[in-house]
Amino acid sequence: WQKVGKYWYYLQNYTVVTNKSMKRGSVNGYLDSQGRFSTGWVIYSDYYDQVRYIDPDSGSKYLTNTRRWIDGKLYYFDKDGYRRNDVSSIYGGPYYLEVDKTNGVMTVYTNSSKSIPVKTIRVSVGLSGTPTWDGTYRLSRSLRWQPLMGPSWGQYGTHVDGCGQGGIFIHSVAGSTRSVYNLPAGEYLKLGQPASHGCIRTCVADAKWVFENCNGSTIHIYSSGNYVNNESFKGPLGRRPLATFRGAGNFDPTDPEVP
């Protein structure tokens, strides 16, 4: 065995061994196509929130087409071995939602035990001068077009009952009119960092999903104080990237009403 940088490699007859299950000491792992020894969670693309898992008990290549309890949580893996970051087709609501303000991510769980993560949502919370209050609240469906400050309108408003002064909602990035073609691009690009007057902003698709599936659900909002550099590990399902703009860039690219 030889360590180069942060990775271990196995040499046989002065040649780096690749694509093989190996055991280094008491730890099972896998030597990838470059010979790097990996075990447990392995990031394939941090930007796209793609990770795989190598079973340290067997060292066999990535788990595929299965589910597995790992560190007290149940994860699902697709045919290519990637962690499934949305299993809402398997688990219905009501849900338990948790907003980590430090990392700009909302994780949806089946219940308050937080043992089964269901979905990850990229969010913007309040700026330091207009913070989103910590606490545990109940969600109630509000309006398809939610009137907000300005005036402005966000899509698919869900009220966070009891948070702030009674006007804190989960909603899409707001525009100055009730039109899907009135997106302020600069505000959309802030998703994932504090940007609001206290509301919880998401992309349109996620706001719609919460609106349709989380009425009556519990939400816990907190500051973890632990900023995580890797997108893939901002919560148990990581944090998805922003969808890129299409066309004129004046609409949310996740909006199902825009062809």
Predicted features and spans:
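Short, solvent-exposed loop/turn segments that connect beta-strands within catalytic domains
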Residues: 46-49, 112-116, 164-166
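Cell wall/extracellular polymer interaction/catalysis modules
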Residues: 81-145, 155-156, 252, 257-259
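A short, compositionally biased
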Residues: 25, 48, 99-105, 153-154, ...
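Extracellular adhesion/carbohydrate-binding repeat motifs centered on closely spaced tryptophans
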Residues: 1-94, 150
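Short, surface-exposed linear segments at secondary-structure transitions and domain or protein termini
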Residues: 27-28, 71-74, 125-136, 179-182
